Amino acid sequence: MPFFLVQRSFAEQLDLSRDEITVLEGANLDAGIRWIEAFLTADRMQSYCLFEAPSADVIRAASAAAGMPIDSIVEVSSLLGRVAAPAG
C-alpha cells in the first residue's frame, strides 16, 4: 500500500486531547488508513503526517469527515528509516 505525506495548516494552535486523537485514529483505521507518524511545527499551526493508505482520495475523504484541513498530499515512494542519533 502506498505512503502519503499530508501537510495541514490550522487557524488556531492545534491542541488535541488523547481522546480526540483516539477518535481520529479509529476513523482512519475504519477508512483503511494507517497513521504512521505526525509532526507539529513549533507554533502548533501546521502538521505533517505520514500515512499508509489505499489512495490520496481516501485520505481526503476521511479528513473531510473528521473536519481536518489538508494543504497538500504527496505520495512518497519509500521510507528511508529513522535517524538513530543526532549528527555531530
PLM regions and their residue ranges:
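Short S/T/G/P-rich N-terminal loop/turn motif that feeds into the first structured element of a domain
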Residues: 1-30, 34-36, 41-45, 78-88
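Short hydrophobic/aromatic beta-strand micro-patches
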Residues: 9, 50-52
